[in-house]
Amino acid sequence: MASPDIFVEDYSAAVDFLGKQKFVDRERISAIGICGLGSHVLTAAAIDVRIKVVATSVMYDMSDSMWKGLNNTKTEEQRELEKDYLAKMRWQEVDEGPVGGPHELAFDENNKPIYWSKMFPDKLPADADPVTKQFFDYYVGRAFHPRSVNSNGAWDALTPWSYYNFPLQQRIETIKQPKLIVTGEKAHARYMAEEAYNRLKDPKELVIVPNATHVDLYDQMDKIPFDKFDEFFKENL
């Protein structure tokens, strides 16, 4: 199960823990969020000013992506269909216990919700879109783990529920701490990083990694701009 409140609180709880360590300077604690955690870390930093520096890499605004769809393609009709779907899933969980399902609901050619109980099939169809293939190659391939939800299971079917009610990044314009936003030139969610960057106030920096896709910046050591992250944190802490 994912929840915007829990994920945001995780960052503040991590600051709590670090701040209790004798070897940690409480005035030099920073945070970074990758993919969906990018929107959560900005949300956390807007209120928790103990986070002195914040960075994101290939950030995803999970609440926007769930509610509006990738590239804002979800229709009002689809949102109503999804509410009906979530209501059915909730009753099913009441009667039977937890039910696995997608954290972002897709629709078929007849505008019907597509339900599945596993994030990825064992084998992708030949006509799979490039973004799905990139995620598949990562989660089912080189980053596979038997206990990973994305590798070998599914999220709770009710995951979108809380994200619909409680959008992320509501106050990121108030973040005064230094901010670094990194994304890939070819990342399918690049626009989310750019939209967040445009809302942020100085000091801020946007880095677009040439030829990098979203998933490239998960683990491709030759594309992740480690030097930039290192420079940013050293200069601002």
Language model segments and positions:
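Short beta-strand/loop motif that positions the catalytic acidic residue
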Residues: 175, 181-183
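Catalytic active-site module of serine/aspartate enzymes centered on a nucleophile-bearing elbow/loop
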Residues: 210-237
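Active-site nucleophile elbow and catalytic-triad environment of alpha/beta-hydrolase enzymes
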Residues: 69, 154-171, 177
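Alpha/beta-hydrolase-fold enzymes
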Residues: 43-134
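Alpha/beta-hydrolase active-site loop
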Residues: 1-22
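Conserved loop-alpha-helix segment in the C-terminal half of the alpha/beta-hydrolase fold
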Residues: 185-204
